[in-house]
């Protein structure tokens, strides 16, 4: 039995609280069970140098964990003087995922930065960041339209992500920390609302996984992500 008595295909209790902070164009507190991430979207005029004059926008991301978001305190990366490899990998994943949701040509020469700060970690922080940041991004784009800076919303659709894995021989969706740390196979899946995949990151921590197990995990992820899409739509409808 899973720690919270969840069914194998069940996502943890999910909450998306919009307008969580007052300054950012978009802000969302996303909670998957005990994992809590604050996602903010900041709009700035102009684009990176490599895009200047091309008439398109850019979406980037930063990710970080508060020192006591985990069981024991981790020093801030700023105090260490550099970001770790895990942090860089995750923020690139978040940015890639959210760029897929937007027509950058229609965005024009604006840059949107998504800041994902983990308040409390209990597994799935990168996937929670993507799912929460998507809602913050939607609010930021709506603000650009409402303020007359864009004629039409360039968002192509929602993006969501979930972790899946094999634990004690069983395929599970939305792993919490105790499951993730014991997983024989761990996978993160990012999808568009229409079912197309943006990213699949899968690793065999123990025994290699079979083709059939891969397909089963992807099907499990699709079901979990559909649940997240429903929550995103409900949050944006408020």
Swiss-Prot record:
Keyword Transmembrane assigned: no
GO terms of molecular function: 3'-5'-RNA exonuclease activity; tRNA binding; tRNA nucleotidyltransferase activity
Stated family: Belongs to the RNase PH family.
Residues where phosphate binds: 86, 124-126
Reactions this protein catalyses: tRNA(n+1) + phosphate = tRNA(n) + a ribonucleoside 5'-diphosphate
One Pfam family recorded for the sequence: RNase_PH_C
EC numbers on record: 2.7.7.56
Family annotation (HAMAP family): RNase_PH (MF_00564)
Organism: Serratia proteamaculans (strain 568)
Keyword terms of this UniProt record: Nucleotidyltransferase, RNA-binding, rRNA processing, Transferase, tRNA processing, tRNA-binding
Role: Phosphorolytic 3'-5' exoribonuclease that plays an important role in tRNA 3'-end maturation. Removes nucleotide residues following the 3'-CCA terminus of tRNAs; can also add nucleotides to the ends of RNA molecules by using nucleoside diphosphates as substrates, but this may not be physiologically important. Probably plays a role in initiation of 16S rRNA degradation (leading to ribosome degradation) during starvation.
Keyword Plastid applies: no
SUPFAM superfamilies (UniProt xref): Ribonuclease PH domain 2-like (SSF55666), Ribosomal protein S5 domain 2-like (SSF54211)
Coiled coil (residue ranges): none
Alphabetical list of InterPro entries matching this protein: ExoRNase_PH_dom1 (IPR001247), ExoRNase_PH_dom2 (IPR015847), ExoRNase_PH_dom2_sf (IPR036345), PNPase/RNase_PH_dom_sf (IPR027408), Ribosomal_Su5_D2-typ_SF (IPR020568), RNase_PH (IPR050080), RNase_PH_bac-type (IPR002381), RNase_PH_CS (IPR018336)
Assembly and interaction partners: Homohexameric ring arranged as a trimer of dimers.
Protein known as: Ribonuclease PH
Biological process according to GO: rRNA catabolic process; rRNA processing; tRNA processing
Group of enzyme by EC: transferase
């Amino acid at each position: 039995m899973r720690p919270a008595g969840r069914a194998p295909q069940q996502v943890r209790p999910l909450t998306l609280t919009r307008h969580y902070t007052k300054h950012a164009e978009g802000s969302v507190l996303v909670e998957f069970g005990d994992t809590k991430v604050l996602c903010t979207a900041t709009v700035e005029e102009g684009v990176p140098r490599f895009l200047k004059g091309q008439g398109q926008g850019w979406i980037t991301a930063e990710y970080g964990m508060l020192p006591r978001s985990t069981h024991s305190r981790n020093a801030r990366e700023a105090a260490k003087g550099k970001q770790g490899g895990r942090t860089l990998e995750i923020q690139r994943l978040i940015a890639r995922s959210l760029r897929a949701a937007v027509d950058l040509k229609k965005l024009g020469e604006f840059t949107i930065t998504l800041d994902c700060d983990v308040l409390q970690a209990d597994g799935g922080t990168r996937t929670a960041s993507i799912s929460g940041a998507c809602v913050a991004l939607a609010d930021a784009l709506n603000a650009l339209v409402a303020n007359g800076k864009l004629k039409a919303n360039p968002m192509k659709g929602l993006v969501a992500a979930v972790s899946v894995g094999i634990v004690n021989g069983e395929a599970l969706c939305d792993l919490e920390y105790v499951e993730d740390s014991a997983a024989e196979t761990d996978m993160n899946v990012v999808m568009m609302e229409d079912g197309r995949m943006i990213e699949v990151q899968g690793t065999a921590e123990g025994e290699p996984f079979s083709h059939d197990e891969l397909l089963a995990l992807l099907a499990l992820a699709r079901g979990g992500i559909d649940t997240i899409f429903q929550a995103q739509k409900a949050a944006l409808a408020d």
